[in-house]
Design a protein with these regions (language model features):
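Basic, Lys/Arg- and aromatic-enriched nucleic-acid-binding interface segment
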Residues: 162-185
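N-terminal DNA-binding module of tyrosine recombinases/phage integrases
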Residues: 1-46, 77, 81
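N-terminal core-binding DNA-recognition domain of tyrosine recombinases/integrases
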Residues: 28-43, 53-148, 163, 167-168
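Hydrophobic (often cysteine-bearing) scaffold residues that line and stabilize catalytic clefts
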Residues: 44, 114, 153, 182-185
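Short, charged, amphipathic alpha-helices and their helix-cap/turn boundaries
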Residues: 154-163
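Ser/Thr-centered flexible coil motifs
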Residues: 83, 153, 171-172
Length: 185
């Protein structure tokens, strides 16, 4: 039997990882993942599963109705009971929260991605008429602020080039490599 290609191996790893994540998610999400299987990449499905796990952990921790419920046993009815304000509270929670004693923070891009996972899930159930309302459509996507490009000024560029050429402030081993590369180049 021929060995599997790299892509086949990676695909199989993704399938196993997705199955592992699905076992930690509410049972009703199996239909959702089956529904998006052919329209999304395996890594996207894994990212969605991870983000939805965070969402359902939030539901479990903040909703008294689900405090003593295992995430796997949360029912589909939760989607109908949530409104746009609940989703906005979740997005606010994502900015900074504690999990397993560690403080976690998400920037605008991460929050937007997590909201995209929720949008996709709600869209699937709404499109298939399993839920009547889709409160996520009422929530605006976070604005992504452009990162400022940090550039070296002319003086800093000159200093950098001088250090590279001269090999100053290098360890003995680095200096030996520098000398060899200098001769080669």
């Amino acid at each position: 039997m021929a060995e599997k290609t790299y892509h086949e191996q990676e695909r199989n790893k993704c399938i196993l990882e997705l199955r592992r994540l699905q076992s930690e998610l509410p049972k009703f999400l199996k239909d959702y993942f089956r529904g998006i299987e052919y329209s999304t990449a395996p890594r996207t499905q894994i990212a969605y599963a991870t983000d939805l796990k965070t969402f359902f952990e939030y539901i479990k921790d903040t909703n008294s109705m689900y405090k003593n419920t295992d995430i796997h046993d949360i029912d589909l009815g939760i989607l109908s009971r949530l409104n746009a304000q609940d989703i906005e509270e979740y997005l606010d929670y994502l900015k900074l929260y504690t999990k397993n004693g560690h403080e976690l923070a998400n920037d605008e891009r991460a929050i937007k991605r997590k909201l995209s996972a929720l949008r996709s899930m709600y869209h699937y159930y709404h499109k298939n008429r399993i839920i009547k309302e889709n409160p996520v459509t009422q929530v605006d996507l976070p604005k992504i602020h452009k990162k400022q490009i940090i550039r070296l000024d002319d003086e800093e560029v000159g200093e950098l080039l001088n250090v590279v050429e001269s090999g100053d402030h290098l360890t003995k081993k680095q200096s030996e490599c520098h000398d060899k590369l200098k001769v080669r180049d």
